Amino acid sequence: MDIKAYFELIRLKNCLTASFGAFIGGLIASYFNLAMVDNLILASIVVFLVCGFGNALNDIYDLKIDRINKPKRPIPSKRITLNNAKVFSYSLVVMGLFISLFNISCFLMAVLNSIVLQQYASTYKKNKIIGNLIVAYLTGSVFIFGGIAVGNIDVTIMLFLCALFAMWSREIIKDYEDIEGDLKEKVISIPIKCGERSIYIAAFLLIFAIFLSPLPYLFGFFGIYYMISVVFCDLLFLFGIYKLVFNPSKMEAKKASRNIKIVTNLVLIAFLIGSLFK
């Protein structure tokens, strides 16, 4: 068995990033209560397995396209058979759901996200108007999952909302960057429907994420150190989207997309600072 091919199928780096997000979300929600580490480890394993299921499922549904566009992927290159990929992907989700039973709320959310991943791969991947929102939801939901694992979702809901709107904005910007390829693949996206106006939609979503970012401070969950950190992040967000709005080129879109990804990680650090130095 080609282990490397299976790691490639599940996109190992993405799975590790998602599971780390759940762990960090739980740390933030528990204010670094180390008594909750066991729950956080279990939650991280669940997220890893369910994420792997979703990524493998994408390759299964994309087989026809990948034979042309990505022939070196594990299934079209025949390093993994289609049947083995199906068995493997569903084995991952079954294991993930079983482990999630350590907390009934975690189990219910794992079931929900597994269904969402199935629907995304089978139905909404070519309809990016809905697909972008799904990707943004899934990205942010790992933080809530970590919060559920430790029994406190108050702060992680705010982190989820900030991540959701920032990632939703980023997905639209990425589609603007890839508009020619999406036209060839007959994909439905906001940039295809709206053209350059889609940049204003992306800017609005990002500004809404910025608008939400002070809430943990205003509601008394975090102190001034969080506020200082997140204002710095907000300024970086604004700088990137400002440049794109006034120069809506593909190159600037690429820079803005990268900026949002980096700054979203900095926002996560701001939440960590807020949790540590309340």
Curated annotation (Swiss-Prot):
Q: Give coiled-coil spans as residue ranges.
A: none
InterPro entries per the record?
A: DGGGP_synth, Prenyltransferase_related, UbiA_prenyltransferase, UbiA_sf
- Give the matching Pfam families: UbiA
Any one of the GO BP annotations: glycerophospholipid biosynthetic process
Biochemical pathway: Membrane lipid metabolism; glycerophospholipid metabolism
Query: How is this protein situated with respect to the membrane?
Result: Multi-pass membrane protein
Broad class of the protein's primary localization: membrane
User: What job does this protein perform?
Assistant: Prenyltransferase that catalyzes the transfer of the geranylgeranyl moiety of geranylgeranyl diphosphate (GGPP) to the C2 hydroxyl of (S)-3-O-geranylgeranylglyceryl phosphate (GGGP). This reaction is the second ether-bond-formation step in the biosynthesis of archaeal membrane lipids.
CDD domains named among the record's database cross-references: PT_UbiA_DGGGPS
Name the record gives this protein? Digeranylgeranylglyceryl phosphate synthase
Q: Which Gene Ontology cellular component terms are annotated?
A: plasma membrane
Listed under catalytic activity are: sn-3-O-(geranylgeranyl)glycerol 1-phosphate + (2E,6E,10E)-geranylgeranyl diphosphate = 2,3-bis-O-(geranylgeranyl)-sn-glycerol 1-phosphate + diphosphate
Compartments in which it is found: Cell membrane
What is the similarity comment for this entry? Belongs to the UbiA prenyltransferase family. DGGGP synthase subfamily.
Q: What is its EC number?
A: 2.5.1.42
Cofactors named for this entry: Mg(2+)
- Which UniProt key words apply to this protein? Cell membrane, Lipid biosynthesis, Lipid metabolism, Magnesium, Membrane, Phospholipid biosynthesis, Phospholipid metabolism, Transferase, Transmembrane, Transmembrane helix
